[in-house]
A protein has these predicted regions:
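A ligand-binding cleft/hinge motif common to bilobed small-molecule-binding domains
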Residues: 86, 99-108, 156-159, 186-220
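Ligand-binding cleft/hinge of the Venus flytrap
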Residues: 60-72, 114, 137-139, 150-172, ...
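Extracytoplasmic small-molecule ligand-binding "clamshell" domains
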Residues: 30-100, 107, 167-170
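Short, hydrophobic alpha-helical packing/hinge segments within bilobed ligand-binding/sensory domains
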Residues: 83-88, 175-179, 185, 195
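Flexible hinge/capping segments at coil-to-helix
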Residues: 126-145
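C-terminal motif of bacterial Sec signal peptides marking the signal peptidase cleavage site
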Residues: 24-25
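Hydrophobic residues within well-ordered alpha-helices
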Residues: 66, 88-89, 140, 179-181, ...
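Periplasmic-binding protein-like
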Residues: 45-46, 118-126, 200-244
Length: 250
């Protein structure tokens, strides 16, 4: 009986040891392996956003929280928005965090879209004093509407604007806002932002008026994602797990 009892204890201990080895092995296998070990290289469109209404600030804070949880150092790379989603597929960055919508024509081999972390609806920004003059894009015939090159807003305006609407294209929102502030633009095509639960994310104060709210594709959410480099092992699953447990914005 003593020998049987001893043998049973040995077998039980071996089983526990094997389980621990398997768990440790899985943990090692699931470690994030970035393009540069320990460094998360992230593409953004703004170097140091400070405005509480700036989506790039929300995204930056979100990525910083992710990196802190996984003990990664961040290397920020400031890029133009247009075609920024290609950087991950070219192995230039681990993560594209430029607020990319998951349009099929932005998907490329070598990178994968994350789960969505917010969604948007299209709108037009106007001056408060013009609120009685404008309601819909068709009211801007003979007027100038600004868009950022490559963004969903550009697609939307090009599709919806009737003949006679002047479309001004720039590379950045900063340039658009500067022109808007000095009266060179009558409206800016941009977005209203929403958390996944449908709550509006405040993106402007009372001095800003957004009109003509609509879905880019009627009845379909325009979802924003991160673009993750496929060579950055286990990064996609970690990002998706983080999105699942962490509400955006923080």
């Amino acid at each position: 009986m003593n020998r049987l009892g001893t043998l049973s204890r040995v077998i039980a201990r071996l089983a526990i040891l094997c389980t621990l080895i398997a768990v440790i092995g899985c943990a090692v296998d699931q470690q994030i392996q970035t393009l540069r070990p320990g460094v998360l290289t992230v593409a953004v469109t703004s170097g140091a956003p400070t405005n509480q209404y700036d989506p790039q600030l929300w995204i930056r804070q979100y990525v910083e929280q992710f990196a802190a949880e996984y003990e990664l150092t961040i290397s920020w790379v400031v890029v133009p928005f247009n075609e920024s989603w290609l950087l991950a597929s070219r192995d230039e960055v681990d993560l594209v965090a430029t607020n990319v919508a998951n349009f099929p024509d932005r998907a490329h081999s070598g990178a994968t879209f994350s789960a969505p972390f917010l969604y948007e609806r299209r709108a037009l920004r106007i001056n408060p004093e013009d609120q009685e003059r404008y309601e819909h894009i068709s009211d801007f015939i003979g007027k100038t509407v600004g868009v950022v090159s490559g963004m969903a807003a550009e697609r939307d305006v090009n599709r919806r604007a009737p003949d006679g609407v002047i479309v001004r294209t720039t590379d950045t929102f900063a340039q658009l806002y500067a022109e808007f502030d000095v009266g060179q633009l009558d409206a800016i095509a941009e977005a209203e932002y929403y958390a996944l639960d449908g709550q509006v994310i405040p993106s402007h104060g009372s001095e800003v008026i957004l009109i003509d709210h609509h879905d880019l594709t009627p009845g379909q959410r325009e979802e924003s994602v991160f673009v993750v480099c496929d060579k950055s092992q286990n990064l996609l699953s970690a990002v998706n797990a983080f999105i699942a447990r962490t509400r955006f914005p923080l």
